């Protein structure tokens, strides 16, 4: 899967800013709490492709994305405005994120974790990171980036 060190390096600041929103939503909407991070990964990849000199220097890229239309509508904002998706890609992306979030949630629930513990928190953050990276990879692939083996020598 395509990846970028710049996008990966943005993870700590994205996660720190996202966690208060994600944790608040997890109780009532756990799949949303997970899935929205995949959208954020897609948006960060799109920003990386468009103008990383600007977006890469934003101190809180997540808040920039969220505050455009709010947390609840962030998925639609990212698909419509950031990624500029039209039907059918708009709907297919929604289905992909929903499936990934639900499968991740199912795997998380199968873990022998006590809610409210450090271990449960760490597992949640690990899931968010994977979804962020998956979202970035999906968008980089959509933008026709491909990973290739390099021959040195």
Where are the model-predicted features located?
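Intrinsic-disorder/low-complexity detector
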Residues: 1-153
